[in-house]
Swiss-Prot record:
Glycans are attached at residue 58. It comes from Verticillium alfalfae (strain VaMs.102 / ATCC MYA-4576 / FGSC 10136) (Verticillium wilt of alfalfa). The active site is at 201. It comes from the Eukaryota. Belongs to the peptidase M43B family. This is Extracellular metalloprotease VDBG_01143. Secreted metalloproteinase that allows assimilation of proteinaceous substrates. The lineage of its organism: Eukaryota, Fungi, Dikarya, Ascomycota, Pezizomycotina. Zn(2+) binds at residues 200, 204. GO terms for biological process: proteolysis. Keywords: Disulfide bond, Glycoprotein, Hydrolase, Metal-binding, Metalloprotease, Protease, Secreted, Signal, Zinc. It is an enzyme of class 3 (hydrolase). InterPro entries: MetalloPept_cat_dom_sf, Peptidase_M43. Its main location: secreted. Its EC number is 3.4.24.-.
């Protein structure tokens, strides 16, 4: 089962002239797979550890997480309309990641950019073959792929950090983040062209779940300071309270909801701690 929107509008076709047509408004859709039982179990273990550290008051200075980014532009042709991003679009996306994650001591450095014209890969066909050909670096390096369209009409998807990611394994090869090229800053995806799809998916890559994970019952996204949420948000519904029996309004400004890019603002302190816990456990 995939984390994805149940209500996805059809995208407007891009003209063959190379002009970047504005895509029709739609609901955010994330294609990241549900976390495995192992991953949820580890989230619970880390949550307990984080709570003990907070209770003890034994808070030590932590190092900044420095992430090398290998940016893979995968296009259907050598036009922006077909996914061939400019250098500025690439660096602007990295700048968004740095701005959004800086308060949480995570920094991104563009280690390299490559461009590939392959119609099938640009439309998310044969993911493993594409990544086997393009992937670079180690398990702590972020491989970020931009493509023209993704499976199930998602705007992006990512792979959670996990055990067993030995060099050359399928887990290692497929690791990374894929986003629609139209979602980078200056892209054509209406409502989602400020680069925040990248932030959302990198959040998954660092171990975070959707804020609406689990709905109004149970332990939800396994982070104690994100209010319970019955379902994903759409747009920027100020004051939404989909779990009235639980404390707090829906976290519509949280990067791990499905709000419009202009609505996104934050990660919580609990998500901040979880990012660092998962990094230390699996990627450091």
């Amino acid at each position: 089962m995939l984390f994805k929107s149940l209500f996805v509008a059809a995208a407007t076709a891009v003209g063959v002239s190379g002009h970047v047509a504005r895509e029709a408004p739609r609901t955010f859709g994330c294609g990241t797979h549900e976390p495995s039982a192992e991953h949820v179990g580890m989230s619970k273990v880390l949550a307990a550890q984080e709570a003990r550290v907070l209770e003890s008051g034994n808070l030590t200075a932590r190092a900044t997480i420095n992430v090398n980014v290998y940016f893979h532009v995968v296009a259907a042709s050598q036009t922006v309309a077909n996914g061939y991003l400019t250098d500025k679009m690439v660096t602007d996306q990295i700048a968004v990641l740095n701005r959004d994650f800086a308060p949480h001591d995570v920094a991104f450095r563009l280690a390299g950019t490559d461009r590939t014209v392959n119609t099938g890969w640009a439309r998310d066909s044969n993911e493993i073959a594409m990544k086997r050909a393009l992937r670079k670096g180690t398990y702590k390096d972020l491989n970020l792929y931009t493509q023209v369209s993704l499976t199930d009409n998602a705007l992006g998807y990512a792979y959670f950090p996990t055990s067993g990611a030995t060099s050359g394994s399928t887990t290692f090869i497929r690791d990374g983040v894929s986003i629609k090229a139209q979602t980078v800053p200056g892209g054509s995806q209406a409502g989602f062209n400020l680069g925040k799809t990248g932030t959302h998916e990198v959040g998954h890559w660092l171990g975070l779940y959707h804020t609406f994970q689990g709905g109004c019952t149970g332990s939800g996204d396994q982070v104690s300071d994100t209010p319970a949420q019955a379902s994903f948000s759409s747009g920027c519904p100020i004051g939404r309270d989909s779990c009235p029996g639980q404390a707090g309004l829906d976290p519509i400004h949280n990067y791990m909801d499905y709000s419009d890019d202009s609505c996104y603002e934050e990660f919580t302190p609990g998500q901040d701690a979880r990012i660092h816990s998962f990094w230390t456990t699996y990627r450091a």
